């Protein structure tokens, strides 16, 4: 059984269990208690954010759909995939120097999140670049092919690691006061990812009131 089929089976098993018992499953992410919702005028102003949405992964052999929850800051990422009933089937927590993946009741560790996810799941997903694309930005290895009338990217190519990623910004929305993508499509060789952001919230350090102890 390939890795994607194993993960699909895991999600189906957790979905069945939650349907029968109405219990949330494998693992719950700890909250980022040091961050609070903020409003920004440009997504680049948000050094931290959280999103809720849907992720679809397709290969020639299989396909997978799941809810995605992602909390991102400059030094920490917490990514969770769940079934439609909310049962957690995969969590990936990482810092710049460490990564911990929990899937199918097993724990895996590495010092690189992208390498860890590829080793366990078989997906070569550009985790380092996704935070830029999710906020409508482009990186130094991105070549913008098409922009819309407002100058926002519609299509780009990422050539950091061949074969290149083709990224399409299918639609945009206003969230937390900023314009961010609503739907993204990533294609590379025989792997296709579709990401829909249903909610994107900019996060920041809470303000310290006068007279309040830091």
Swiss-Prot record:
Function: Plays a critical role in the incorporation of lipoproteins in the outer membrane after they are released by the LolA protein.
InterPro entries assigned: LolA/LolB/LppX (IPR029046), OM_lipoprot_LolB (IPR004565)
Lipid-anchored residues (N-palmitoyl cysteine): 26
Lipid attachment in record (S-diacylglycerol cysteine): 26
Main location class: membrane
Compartments in which it is found: Cell outer membrane
Keyword field: Cell outer membrane, Chaperone, Lipoprotein, Membrane, Palmitate, Protein transport, Signal, Transport
Gene designation per UniProt: lolB
GO terms, biological process: lipoprotein localization to outer membrane; protein transport
Name this polypeptide is given: Outer-membrane lipoprotein LolB
Signal peptide from the UniProt entry: 1-25
Subunit structure comment from the entry: Monomer.
Record organism: Shewanella baltica (strain OS195)
Transmembrane feature ranges: none
Similarity section: Belongs to the LolB family.
Membrane topology label: Lipid-anchor
Matches recorded under Gene3D superfamilies: Lipoprotein localisation LolA/LolB/LppX
GO-annotated cellular components: cell outer membrane
Alphabetical list of Pfam families matching this protein: LolB
């Amino acid at each position: 059984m390939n890795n994607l089929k194993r993960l699909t089976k895991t999600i189906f098993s957790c979905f069945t269990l939650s349907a029968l018992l109405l219990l949330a499953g494998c693992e719950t992410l700890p909250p980022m208690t040091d961050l609070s919702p903020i409003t920004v005028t440009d997504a680049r102003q948000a050094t931290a954010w959280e999103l809720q949405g849907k992720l679809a992964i397709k290969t020639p052999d299989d396909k997978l759909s799941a809810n995605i929850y992602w909390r991102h800051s400059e030094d920490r990422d917490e990514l969770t995939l769940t079934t439609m009933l909310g049962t957690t089937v995969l969590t990936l927590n990482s810092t710049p120097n460490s990564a911990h993946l929990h899937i199918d009741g097993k724990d895996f560790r590495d010092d690189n999140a992208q390498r860890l996810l590829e080793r366990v799941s078989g997906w070569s997903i550009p985790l380092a670049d996704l935070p830029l694309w999710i906020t409508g930005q482009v990186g130094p290895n991105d070549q913008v092919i098409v922009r819309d009338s407002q100058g926002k990217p519609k299509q780009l190519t990422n050539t950091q690691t061949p074969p290149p990623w083709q990224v399409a910004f299918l639609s945009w929305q206003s969230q937390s006061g900023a314009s961010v993508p609503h739907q993204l499509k990533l294609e590379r060789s025989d792997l296709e990812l579709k990401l829909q952001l249903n909610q994107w919230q900019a996060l920041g350090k809470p303000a310290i009131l006068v007279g309040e102890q830091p």
